[in-house]
Amino acid sequence: IAAYLFGGIICDYISIKKLIPAAMISTGALGLVMLTIPSPIIMVIIHGLFAITCLMLFFPAQTKAVRNLASVNEQGKAFGIFEGGRGISNAVYLAIAALIFGQMTIIKSESFGVRGIILFYSVMTILLGVIDIVLLKGIDDGKKGDSNDTVNLKMLTKPLKMPAVWLMIG
């Protein structure tokens, strides 16, 4: 929950051109660490770091990037195209992951298949993070960090008093 609360604030002060690639590359790197078959404590730490890289850094910056790509009158269309594209790419990734799992299970074992899936998703996430460094150069990141806005408790509690926020949460 804390990751969601602070993610939006962070992407208002740090460029999404830096946040998105950094979050993706670090998430992929954490996946590669999982391949070393770490201890249970390290696995818990890795999943905690996933919360930071994905929920606090990546998703708010991704939402801001999509929002900045469209005019005020085209927000619905932009998010619809984005979600549709994300659904299609997820289906393709899932098909590839299933193929990898099936082939690696035939070769060795189910655990070998799971390791293949982790490797696939980790490498793809790192590659896409590197590609994003180039692709995000032309996007307006809408960074507000240059202003004198300070984060205070009143700013954080204001959305909690809005019925629309609670409607979206529910």
Where in this protein do the model-derived segments appear?
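Glycine-rich segments within core transmembrane alpha-helices of 12-TM secondary carriers
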Residues: 76-102
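Intracellular juxtamembrane helix-capping segments at the cytosolic ends
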Residues: 56-71
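Hydrophobic core of transmembrane alpha-helices in multi-pass small-molecule transporters
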Residues: 30, 41-57
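Juxtamembrane intracellular "pre-TM" segments in multi-pass secondary transporters
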Residues: 139-167
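Central cavity-lining transmembrane alpha-helices of secondary-active solute carriers
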Residues: 1-9
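C-terminal membrane-cytosol helix-exit motif in multi-pass small-molecule transporters
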Residues: 122-144
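Primarily marks hydrophobic transmembrane alpha-helices of the MFS/SLC 12-helix fold
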Residues: 17-20
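C-terminal ends and interior cores of transmembrane alpha-helices
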Residues: 25-39
